[in-house]
Regions:
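Acetyl-CoA-dependent GNAT
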Residues: 5, 9-78, 89-91, 95, ...
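Conserved hydrophobic beta-strand within the GNAT/NAT acetyltransferase core sheet
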Residues: 70, 104-108
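Conserved acetyl-CoA-binding loop-helix of GNAT-fold acetyltransferases
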Residues: 81-94, 113-122
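Residue-level recognition of the GNAT/N-acetyltransferase active site
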Residues: 76, 80, 109-111
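Short acidic N-proximal helix/loop "leader" segments that mark the beginning
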Residues: 1-2
Length: 124
């Protein structure tokens, strides 16, 4: 049985599940309030990936003057190696292009080899 994935804009109702993923992965996690504030800002793009109705991953980007700053990207350990991160990035770029973003940038730890491989594969 394969899962059905849906990429959609993050809502405030999603922020609790997103915060749980964030806390399980990062040493300095964003709070639920930080995600709620970010997804309310019209200049931002915050997306989630649902796997059969469960939040499996998320990404976020701030947009300013044609630049997209990718601020967050995480996939729950239970859903890794399924292509979710790439789907999220591609969807985020589409939303960014709709907001006239012409260049994207991000930061990643040198030790995060899977993320580096994904970003390089996508041309970052």
């Amino acid at each position: 049985m394969s899962l059905k994935y849906v990429i959609r804009p993050m809502t405030e109702d999603d922020t609790f599940a997103v915060e749980l993923i964030e806390q399980g992965i990062f040493s300095l996690p964003w709070s639920q309030k930080s995600f709620a504030d970010a997804c309310r800002n019209q200049g931002n793009v915050y997306l989630v990936c649902e796997a059969d109705g469960v939040i499996a991953g998320y990404c976020g980007m701030w947009t300013v003057l044609g630049e997209g700053n990718i601020t967050n990207m995480a996939v729950s350990p239970d859903y890794r190696r399924c292509g979710i991160a790439q789907m999220l990035m591609q969807s985020m770029e589409k939303y960014g292009n709709d907001k006239n973003v012409t260049s994207y940038f991000l930061e990643v730890r040198q030790s995060n080899l899977p993320a580096i491989a994904l970003y390089e594969k996508m041309g970052y």
